[in-house]
Amino acid sequence: DETPYTGWLTLDHKTYYLGENGVMTVGWLLLDGNYYYFSDSGEMQTGWHFISNNWYYLAKDTGIMYSSGWHADPETQTMYYFYSWGGAARNTTLTLNGYRVKFLSWGGISGSTWLYRDGSWYYVKKYSCITDGWHQIDGAWYFMNADGAIRQNESFTYDNNLYFVNNSGKMYQNQWLNWDGKYYYLRSWGGAVQEGWLKLQNKYYYINEDCSRKTQEAFQYDHNLYFVDENGVMI
């Protein structure tokens, strides 16, 4: 007796799954912790599908059902929230990571909101995550990476200027900042003052090449000897 073929099968660019005794799978399949959906003809489905009055998204490359959290539509970059069982949230309001999020009838987000995904914070505006560069939100400035994740608790250079953001991702501005034991002065627009003399409230400070201030040392500048105290003020 021939043992019937079981497992994945691709024919004419269509994918099927043959279960026990070689029977072709239709409907939902749970395999290795992932859900897949097959049409009545047995073809694995991908993309959006309306099943039992709910919208589901099945990954284009694998057919795996999206579930448990935020996912972006790969084509439109629109953000959707999927329940643990796979359906997309729609026509409802949920509290997610402390934010009340209203979902429209088709699943898009009404208005704007912060969202937490894969260990990072994102901001959704007009259905998609804003990306690439500085954005002002509720009066504070945040820097978004290319994928939309905000930078948090770090220093970085952008357009030849040094910036710092706190644990919440907010840009430090208009202040002295102690960062890893060095002091930096951040201008009103956030960029650190660069190399040279800085005058603040009738006091002079000298800023090093790395944008940190000199502290408690003697140094030469333009063939002259200068001294600064423990607070960086020129004596």
Residue positions per predicted region:
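Extracellular adhesion/carbohydrate-binding repeat motifs centered on closely spaced tryptophans
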Residues: 1-235
